[in-house]
Structures are given as C-alpha cells and as structure tokens.
C-alpha cells in the first residue's frame, strides 16, 4: 500500500471514526454532507483511510458506505487497501489464553477482535450489554461460543 501510494506521489490521509467523523454523544450519527464533500475533494488527490481501534466488522454502515480507499483497524494490527488485506499481526495463542484467564479471574468481559467477528468472553455480564448498546455493536458480529486455540484475532 505505502509503496504504491508513494510511487504515485500521493500522501494518504487518515481519519478516526469516534469523535471525528461521527459523534454519537452529540447526535452526529452519519458523515455530515459537508464532510462528505470535503472527503470527495480530498480523494481527488490523496487516498483517504479510516484508522480505528475498531475491527472492520465493528465499523458502522455510515462509515462503510463511504468509498474510503483503505482501513487501518485494530489499532494498526489489520490493514486493508482497496479491499485487500496488506498487513495483519495476530495475537499469539498464548496471549489469548492468558487474557482469558485474567478475564475469568476478574469476572470481566473480554473482546477479541477478528476481521469478521468479535469473540466475546462473558457476554452474559451486564457491562457487555451496556457497551454493545453505547457503541452500536450488532448481535450478528458477536460470537460467544469459540475455541481460543482456533481463532485469529488482532
């Protein structure tokens, strides 16, 4: 991605979602028309990317419906350019196992993000329902029954 973009002499521009393009706290639930117009103009000379701590399946339709050139998700652990994965750094199985043990010991919800879903450990806890509602986490992306030894998360 970077090589192709630099070869073309175009510097990519990165945008966050929460509090930047959208702000649910103040009622901005979609990309504002003025912002879309600015993005359209920007994309004439620079690729526009989303850069988010969210995984792609957790990015709301209001963002996905705009033709961004790429996505840097999971805080940089998964990168797409023009719909293709160009980089991913999976969390080790050992780290996943340890995180699950810590969540068990604390009685806490744990979110493990993959590209296509979010594995939720202890989804029955009230804090998950509160988090899911606040951040518009759709049920169809949540997986609660999983084998930690077989998942790839970032």
What is each residue range found by the language model?
Residues 11-27:
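Asp-based phosphoryl-transfer active-site loop
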Residues 32-130:
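Active-site phosphate-binding/coordination module
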Residues 1-15:
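Non-catalytic pre-domain segments flanking phosphatase-related domains
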Residues 6-8, 43, 104, 151-153:
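Flexible, charged surface loops at secondary-structure boundaries
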Residues 119, 140-154:
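Hydrophobic, aromatic-enriched interface-forming segments
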